[in-house]
Amino acid sequence: MIGGLFIYNHKGEVLIYRVYRDDIGRNAVDAFRVNVIHARQQVRSPVTNIARTSFFHVKRSNIWLAAVTKQNVDAAMVFEFLYKMCDVMAAYFGKISEENIKNNFVLIYELLDEILDFGYPQNSETGALKTFITQQGIKSQHQTKEEQSQITSQVTGQIGWRREGIKYRRNELFLDVLESVNLLMSPQGQVLSAHVSGRVVMKSYLSGMPECKFGMNDKIVIEKQGKGTADETSKSGKQSIAIDDCTFHQCVRLSKSDSERSISFIPPDGEFELMRYRTTKDIILPFRVIPLVREVGRTKLEVKVVIKSNFKPSLLAQKIEVRIPTPLNTSGVQVICMKGKAKYKASENAIVWKIKRMAGMKESQISAEIELLPTNDKKKWARPPISMNFEVPFAPSGLKVRYLKVFEPKLNYSDHDVIKWVRYIGRSGIYETRC
């Protein structure tokens, strides 16, 4: 449970102050200002404990949002609420700034009254909130009985994330599979650690109350304790994509996802995150980095780095950037690269190599001679890892959308009447190779 919520500007002045529990006093406001906002050293942790009081905080631009409690609460739940609160405020009045918060403080207090009940998060869906809290934060006094019953059913009913009566001239559905691949590889090419964090984001512009079914490739198996799913797939001889953990939007019917291996749901209107997942097995590594560092005496280094793309030749990777670290006593660098542009950045102690596009099953290399200043420091250079950024048009986990179906019996439009788009985007997370 959350004891209170404070919103500060960059100076530490309180813009919004709402307390839900008697054990949170006004001194908590000053404690956060002094120990976090005005701290001599930057506070890196998002959770700060001061005098048996926990402060969970996020920062948007120059605005601080702090949830405070003296209870032992689920930190993930508190941060989920804080980020949802930011999204709701942005949906109502745009950019979260001091001016916008001051101009809409009445609206923010109304939103807090609806979102939190005695410190417990209740309803944070923007679509549901907008039905009974207007843009100006003034509740309409001219609602018919039918409109009032619609609001009541949406807030208290089973489908609180979608209002009735939505109509579009053209029914469209956009599905994005967004993945971030993280890697740590040894100089010899051995994978030390690798995992993929993924999200399925949907934009729904559908009329009525549609039923959607989303199916992933047959080989996918969600590993669960007490269920022999991995054994079953190995017996059948099929390779499996094992998802280590997975969370769904509240609109998903979990009972059907377990039994049918498909995700059934009535989607919210507009953009939302359908699911989030993580996998550590059978990852397709888009790039292999092969480093070679040779010390020529005490004042010279020779570096050669080869990158190989490991995907279909018909696909193109974009926004490729390789960062090759250099010693602190570097005096000059001469670079030769086969493709793209490379530049030594003294302020970052790194050679930055950029390539706009690169097709699959190709390789490219860069060579550099690094001149070093003489130093009395006997400690050897630690050789930080080479890092890489990129974007590829496929999912490194191997996840694929098998089907996406829409049914709306009341308005009598079928799956064939819906325009559907599916897109895969794989990006680098922390993608490093030791050298």
Curated annotation (Swiss-Prot):
Leader sequence residues: none
PROSITE patterns named in the record: CLAT_ADAPTOR_M_1, CLAT_ADAPTOR_M_2, MHD
Subcellular location: Cell membrane; Membrane, Coated pit
Modified sites of kind Phosphoserine: 45
List of residues that carry Phosphothreonine: 156
PANTHER family referenced in this protein's UniProt entry, alphabetically: AP COMPLEX SUBUNIT MU
This protein's name: AP-2 complex subunit mu
Gene, per the UniProt record: AP2M1
